Amino acid sequence: MYGKFQQHLQEELKAIEEAGLYKKERNIASAQSAEITLQDGSKALNFCANNYLGLADSPRLAAAAKKAIDARGYGMSSVRFICGTQDIHKELEKAIADYFHTDDAILYAACFDANGGVFEPLLTAEDAIISDSLNHASIIDGVRLCKAQRFRYANADMADLEAKLQEAQACRFRIIVTDGVFSMDGNVAPMDKICDLAEKYDALVMVDESHSAGVVGPTGHGVAEQFGCYGRIDIFTGTLGKAFGGAVGGFTTGRQEIIDMLRQRSRPYLFSNSIPPMIAGAGIEMFKMLKESNELHDRLQANVEYFRDRMMAAGFDIKPTQSAICAVMLYDAPLSQKFAAKMAEEGIFVTGFYYPVVPKGQARIRVQLSAAHRKEHLDKAIAAFIKVGKELGVI
């Protein structure tokens, strides 16, 4: 049987490669940071990590992780409800709830699991999910696992959202679901307007803060802080794998009864091992760091403004951004790959994104800024973009 299936896969893979859509991995042989060493020994500046606050190689977090291993061991060998809950898991959940001004929080192995496990326990075929068209794949998959009726509105389009809410008025419960920051374009969801519509049409609100927590808002606390929406958002999901240290682990935080129900019925929570003690210990320390100072957030914002302004002045087509994501639009998939390859030759580590990660004809280089970037890093990257952009006729 595998012979026929193997041939089918080989043909599919060949077609992907011929279309210029084949994704290849580049191996890093150093800690994740602004400056990295690749497996071939070459050095590069990294502008494609989710390391927004530059904490991925934080000595303080590494020390906290080591301390947790020494005190609580390497792993849990259990799910939470059997014997996989330690005191530090509960302490981290409390820190997350405090950060987002919510009642309680629940930990997952990843935010993909948090989004995949949030809808099915809470909603039935009598209910409606109204989801932004550019929401993350994990939200899309989570919605698919649920029997609720599905409505999709155009990205951040409040008129279309209102129309979909009107369509869903006959449903028992309605929930509006959005990313806080949309990962490919870098735009921020207008949470105040979303909450206004939710109140007008009696709907719940859920936001995925994966790319916004630690980044947007006056002190980096995400879209609820930026738009003054504390108390108006029912469910937050997020990750420890981006601004919050860059490791693994996801979470859902929100109203008490919602979190209680997820503990009882969310399948990724019930049937997956607990996050290891070292992740919990480092996560607790990370939230302590963010309470102490806004320095990392402020440095990140200064880097974003500096890079964006100079790239636009150079003539690049840049998506409007209010986050740490800067999308340099190229539109052509093979061009995005070629551009990324030439940037690597200049010592700049970026990735071309193209279909199916973004819609066809919307290929781009997604630049992600970090608090770890210094001015000389930014200047070198901008100079490389200008050089390669001129070579390839982009500017």
Where are these regions (language model features)?
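N-terminal "arm"/small-domain region of PLP-dependent enzymes with the aminotransferase-like
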Residues: L9-Y74, A203
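Short loop-beta-helix segment that forms the pyridoxal 5′-phosphate
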Residues: V79-T85, K94-G117
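PLP-dependent aminotransferase class I/II
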Residues: F244-M311, F316-K319
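PLP-dependent enzyme catalytic core of the Aspartate aminotransferase-like
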Residues: P59, A63-K67, A71, K94, ...
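Conserved PLP-anchoring active-site segment centered on the Schiff-base-forming lysine
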Residues: V118-A137
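Conserved PLP-binding catalytic core of the aspartate aminotransferase-like
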Residues: D298-F307, M312-G347, V357, G361-Q362, ...
